[in-house]
A protein has these predicted regions:
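Alpha-helical segment proximal to the catalytic Tyr-Lys
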Residues: 129, 172-176, 241
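C-terminal helical subdomain
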Residues: 183, 191, 205-239, 243, ...
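Residue(s) in the substrate-gating loop at a strand-loop-helix junction
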Residues: 143
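Canonical Rossmann dinucleotide-binding motif of NAD(H)/NADP(H)-dependent dehydrogenases/reductases
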Residues: 4-36
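Substrate-binding pocket helix/loop in short-chain dehydrogenase/reductase
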Residues: 100-101, 105-111, 213
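Short C-terminal tail/terminal secondary-structure segment
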Residues: 2, 148, 233, 244-259
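Active-site helix of classical SDR
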Residues: 124, 159, 167
Length: 259
């Protein structure tokens, strides 16, 4: 049974159309939040919103390309007009890329930067503007790639390192405004994002690579989106009111136990 930890709160989740973002939306909806589901894929975002509503929650989809600052500003204005003043924000939207510094083209780097770095920056600007004077909780999705070297993930690692430092900066600059800003660093998590990534990067070898990735986790398996959502709920709820400027790993021991 839900404790309704987010009752009366308005929350926005970017990349809410699938995977971790969808799991966060579904759990936040169960906990009483009024949800704005943002996704560049309008159909996927609406599907998530419909699932939240079917479970008795309140949710609306707002199609949004987080890399476009003007679009982000318009969407944040619209969602607050529809749902109320913003209390919680989860910056989850992101893309992956395979490559070393030599094999990553400038176009590849620009594409990853636009979504994973500029996209978070764009959202953070609108979020802190909305929360100043009333407080709130912001959660950024970083990665184990923020902390350790991972083969063939140059652009992705760069982008997630930037997410982590943006988290620390926002936490420092806005703590006096009652705004908490934290990050979580997932390890390997089984999502449609991962399945699609494996199909594109390793055609014909998806099953082999899935098992290989799962074995990199000391705990012996990939994480599930619902496990990430549970940590997100804690950090965005009043249970975490004394936590800000933190990066919490949720990686099956990938960073601290890897040998």
């Amino acid at each position: 049974m839900s404790d309704h930890k987010l009752a009366g709160k308005v929350a926005v989740v970017t990349g809410g159309g699938s995977g971790i973002g969808r799991a966060i939306c579904l759990l936040f909806g169960q906990e009483g939040a009024r949800l704005a589901v943002l996704d560049v894929d309008a159909d996927a975002g609406e599907d998530t919103a419909a699932r939240v509503r079917a479970a008795g929650g309140v949710a609306e989809c707002f199609p949004c390309d987080v890399s476009a600052q003007g679009q982000v500003e318009s969407v944040f204005a619209a969602l607050q007009e529809r749902l109320g003043a913003l209390d919680i924000a989860v910056n989850n939207a992101g893309i992956a890329h395979v490559g070393t510094v030599e094999t990553t083209s400038e176009a590849d780097l620009d594409r990853v930067y636009a979504v994973n770095v500029k996209g978070v920056y764009n959202c953070l600007r609108s979020e802190v503007s909305a929360m100043k004077g009333r407080g709130g909780a912001i959660l950024n999705l970083a990665s184990v790639a923020s902390s350790v070297g991972i083969p063939d993930r140059f652009a992705y690692s760069m982008s997630k390192g930037a997410v982590l430092t943006m988290t620390y900066s926002v936490a420092c600059d806005y703590v006096a405004h009652g705004i908490r800003c934290n990050a979580i660093a997932p390890g390997r998590v089984h999502t449609p994002f991962v399945d699609g990534f494996l199909r594109r990067a390793y055609p014909g070898r998806e099953a082999e690579m899935f098992q290989k990735l799962a074995r990199t986790q000391p705990i012996g398996r990939m994480g599930e989106p619902e496990e990430i959502a549970a940590l997100a709920l804690f950090l965005c709820s009043d249970d975490a009111r004394f936590i800000t400027g933190s990066n919490l790993p949720i990686d099956g021991g990938f960073v601290s136990l890897k040998v």
